Swiss-Prot record:
Mediates thiosulfate uptake. It comes from Spirochaeta thermophila (strain ATCC 700085 / DSM 6578 / Z-1203). This is Thiosulfate transporter TsuA. It is found in: Cell inner membrane. The gene is tsuA. Belongs to the TsuA/YedE (TC 9.B.102) family. It holds the Pfam family Sulf_transp.
Length: 330
């Protein structure tokens, strides 16, 4: 069933490209331009996923599998990842789908993202990951219809509540904010509400098909790039997440071509390649240190109510705002 990763990735790539979805922009634009369009898209998607993930778990199509809590890793890795995404000009999913659009700076960012992630996971920087690993929290959830046994702690497990309760409460608050506040105008047929629904549905499909393949997690980016590097360097086979990356690039490429938006684009200043390469490297190191990126933690972990994902996501945003301030506002 690992081939389903290619299908899910293809759909994911189409949604990302048509919705112009980048979490770097979603976080950064709120600070720099008071533009909440993409941030609303992200928040509404999280609300839909919170309800969808619990529902799919209850009917037996998946079990949520929150990432372990590691205060040091989540905080440091999250902040470094946030710094890197601004330098790279896109988040993990943003640079990945833009590879398919023909943006050459995204090629460099993605290349160094994968390199940084691979080096931290099993290469030259693996000593750092081993050191961070000692701070992993022993807290976990008990096995149930909702959660895999031994998975990381969640808001519901810490409070001793059925996951439906915090999921519905938080989702309601997110929806009230998204629909109760003024939205920054943007000319697009694929508006934030439609994009959110499509993104949540792809996330749900990703969790179901990934579970059937034995992976037991939803959408991700970092592990896929690591798998591609492993395949190139050690000739190891592609897994579900590696095929997902291939699918994202293909889906975004097809969507861009159909819309007449595919074009090889190069920066006016070649030094930009150095900047995005450094940014990609920081993102890769940060993502592995934090235990996930803006997709594995923010888009997939936060809806599972994972404490690690909420913590890492807060520091994604803080790191993003810090580098945005240094580059554009200082």
């Amino acid at each position: 069933m690992i081939w389903t990763g290619l299908l899910v990735g293809f759909l994911f790539g189409i949604v990302l490209q048509r919705g112009r979805i980048c979490f770097n922009s979603a976080f950064r634009d709120v600070l720099l331009f008071k533009d909440n369009y993409l941030f609303k898209l992200a928040v509404f998607t999280l609300a839909l996923e919170m309800i969808l993930f619990v529902l799919l778990s209850q009917v037996g199509l998946m079990q949520m599998n929150p990432k372990p809590l590691n205060l040091v890793g989540n905080i440091i890795g999250g902040f470094v990842f946030g710094l890197g995404m601004v330098l790279a000009g896109g988040c993990a999913s943003g640079v990945t789908y833009r590879v398919g659009e023909g943006l050459t700076t995204a090629w460099f960012a993605a290349l160094f993202y994968g390199l940084g992630a691979y080096a931290t996971k099993s290469g030259a920087f693996s000593w750092w990951l081993s050191w961070v690993g000692q701070f992993k929290s022993p807290l976990s959830v008990e096995e149930s219809a909702y959660y895999v046994k031994g998975a990381g702690p969640t808001i519901s497990s810490v409070l001793g509540l059925n996951p439906w309760i915090p999921a519905l409460v938080i989702a309601a608050l997110f929806i009230l904010w998204a629909f109760g506040t003024k939205t920054t105008s943007r000319e697009t047929k694929f508006n934030w509400k439609i994009a959110s629904v499509c993104l949540a549905l792809v996330a749900g499909l990703g969790f179901i098909t990934s579970t059937l393949s034995g992976r037991k997690y939803g959408l991700g980016i970092t592990g896929g790039w690591i798998n591609l590097f492993q395949g190139f360097l050690t000739n190891s086979p592609l897994n579900w997440e590696g095929l997902e990356i291939v699918g994202i690039i293909l889906g975004a490429g097809v969507a861009a071509a159909v819309a007449g938006e595919f074009k090889l684009r190069m920066p006016k200043n070649p030094v930009t390649y150095l900047q995005v390469g450094i940014g990609g490297l920081l993102m890769g190191i940060g993502a592995v240190t934090a235990g996930g990126c803006n997709i594995g933690h923010f888009l997939t972990g936060v809806p599972q109510l994972a404490l690690s994902s909420w913590l890492a996501s807060i520091f994604f945003i803080l790191g993003n705002w810090t580098m945005a301030w240094i580059l554009f506002r200082r």
